[in-house]
Amino acid sequence: MKKLILSLCLLLLPTLSVAGNAGYSVDYIRGEGDVEGIKLAARYNAGALSYISDDILLYWEASVNFWEYGAEDNHDTDFVLAVSPVLVKQIGTIKQAPLFLEAGIGLSLIEDTTFADKDVSTHYQFEDRLGLMMQFGNNNEHHVAVRYFHYSNAGFKKPNPGLDFIALSYQREF
């Protein structure tokens, strides 16, 4: 099932490119303890939220995450699907490269509710994020970002220890 979903996501990436407002990202994820992972995402840039402010942008991200924890003798993996709206605002420039702050709260579906010695109690989790992103390239089509992610069920069911991650991301717009 995992391979089918991943294959479907990868097949859909090229079709998003014809939209002109799409892109993809690849994140290296590092969590508490020995948690590591990768996040593959497709994103759609919805543009400015002009009813709020012309300089606040919105993009939608759909992602698949693969997490690993522990040594070979005590190894644990998890698989996550997520969809998240993300607000973006330029906060400055560094050597002519635009610097952005981004924040979002989305929904995720976690395959295994026990991961990295934590019981998160529900398969459905909120995916909160806060990050810094820099654009570069001739048309600012390349992005690098550092993001903090927190997964939690918002206290709907106990226990709710949450899972925290830092991600280093490369994004490309079409």
Where is each model-derived feature located?
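Extracellular loop and loop/strand-boundary signature of outer-membrane beta-barrel proteins
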Residues: 27-28, 70-74, 115-120, 153-156
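Outer-membrane beta-barrel "beta-signal"
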Residues: 40, 136, 162-174
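Transmembrane beta-strands of outer-membrane beta-barrel proteins
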Residues: 22-26, 54-62, 99-105, 142-146, ...
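Cleavable N-terminal export/targeting peptides
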Residues: 1-21
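Transmembrane beta-strands of outer-membrane beta-barrel pores
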Residues: 28-34, 44-46, 62-68, 105-111, ...
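Residue-level signature of outer-membrane beta-barrel architecture
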Residues: 30, 44-46, 50, 89-91, ...
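Residues that define the transmembrane beta-barrel architecture of outer-membrane proteins
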Residues: 34-38, 77-83, 122-128, 162-166
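Short loop/turn motifs that connect adjacent beta-strands in outer-membrane beta-barrel proteins
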Residues: 17-21, 47-56, 92-99, 138-141
